[in-house]
Amino acid sequence: MSDDPKAPYLAAAVFYQDPKAALTWLEEAFGFEPSMVIVDQSGELAHSQMRFGNSLLMVGTEWSERHKSAKSMGGINTQTVHVQLNEGIDAHCERARRAGAEILQEPETQFYGDRTYRALDPEGHIWTFGQTIEEMDPAEWEKTMGLTTRKRL
């Protein structure tokens, strides 16, 4: 995100059956930093925000039929959150594993120069983490993989 508070940005929101537990777990497992927690009169979580670098993640409770945890949907994910690290992806994966994440894909270097892993959180959300290991020009992976890279379809 920009230093300009009015600059446009993209944030993700994830929903949990137990968002309070999720906040604690996401901090422990992935290193996300809580930045705002709003509770209602009964002490239930109304809204929360976490930061990771310049990124914003909102963590909330299930609040409609269209805002559900993967756990409530039989483990179905319609999207994942990708988090790009600057360094330490293997250690990050081990941290997540120690916190109880199921590692769906061990750290592996991809054809485009990033090393990635995938993890499942306690309520079934899939998280992908990446770190650029080698800066590669698209022409390099096109040649190696037989792919075509362009800006638009």
Positions of predicted regions on the chain:
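Vicinal oxygen chelate
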Residues: M1-A13, L23-T24, F30-L120, G130-L153
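Short acidic-aromatic low-complexity motifs
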Residues: Y16-K20
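C-terminal catalytic core of tyrosine-transesterase DNA break-rejoin enzymes
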Residues: E123
